[in-house]
Amino acid sequence: MIINAKGPASFAEKYIVRSIWEDKFPPGSILPAERELSELIGVTRTTLREVLQRLARDGWLTIQHGKPTRVNNFWETSGLNILETIAELNPDGFPELVDQLLSARSSVSAIYFRGAIRNNPEEAIEALSHLSELEDTAQAYAEFDYQLQHTLAFSSGNPLYVLILNGFKGLYSRVGRYYFSSAEARALAMDFYKQLQQLAIDKNYTDVPALMRTYGINSGVMWQSLRDDMPVDLGYSDN
């Protein structure tokens, strides 16, 4: 098992998670005793204990006082916060994961974009007020797009959408930088932003779903033209 990590805690966490992913520690099984596991991984028991607590918070494990640590079925117990981990664990499936992520985001964003323009059109107008100053670079577009999503999610009146976005911020940011490296993708996005801006000015929230649907289809086609050339390390976080 080859694991790239920046320190003992990171190594231990990735070792355990990969072992769960590869069914060496299958769902429902009991982890080895703390001393045995710390020796197996090569970290101190203190470090291991901290890692186990963190993995329990993320839904990988169940820790109960006086009982052995049990491995969970993470598909049932974890949240969006493990998306980046799954991307690292399954690089061959990363393009499909991104497809699913973008599809889910498009479906959800149609709801909160409409809500934002209905409930707080002034905030939507403000968020889109500096389009002429947006630098024509992948980094600038990726940052603007995420911030726009975040602002409108919060302005929609349902802050839970913000938490959903926060769950895949790192992964979405990296994919966004790659997607917006295409000048055509940036031009497509700018056209969408301008149309959205006009809807906000007109307080026309009823036409937002149709605009979102059209942009979702067009950006999806654009993504399909780019996905096969994605860098192999795009799914890896900096941790």
UniProtKB/Swiss-Prot annotation:
Q: What does UniProt give as GO cellular component?
A: cytoplasm
Which residue ranges carry the DNA-binding annotation?
A: 34-53
| Record-level Gene Ontology MF annotations | DNA binding; DNA-binding transcription factor activity; fatty-acyl-CoA binding
Record keywords, A-Z: Activator, Cytoplasm, DNA-binding, Fatty acid metabolism, Lipid metabolism, Repressor, Transcription, Transcription regulation
**What CDD domains does the entry give?**
WHTH_GntR
Which domain of life does the UniProt lineage start with? Bacteria
Where is the protein found, in the record's own terms? Cytoplasm
Sequence ranges assigned to domain HTH gntR-type in this UniProt record: 6-74
InterPro entries, per this entry? Answer: FA-response_TF_FadR, FadR_C, TF_FadR/GntR_C, Tscrpt_reg_HTH_GntR, WH-like_DNA-bd_sf, WH_DNA-bd_sf
- GO terms of biological process kind: fatty acid metabolic process; regulation of fatty acid metabolic process
According to its UniProt entry, the function of this protein is described as: Multifunctional regulator of fatty acid metabolism.
Q: How does it assemble?
A: Homodimer.
NCBIfam families recorded = fadR_gamma, PRK04984.1
Please give the HAMAP family that the UniProt record associates with this protein.
Answer: HTH_FadR
The protein in question is named Fatty acid metabolism regulator protein
From the UniProt record, report the name of the gene that encodes this protein.
fadR
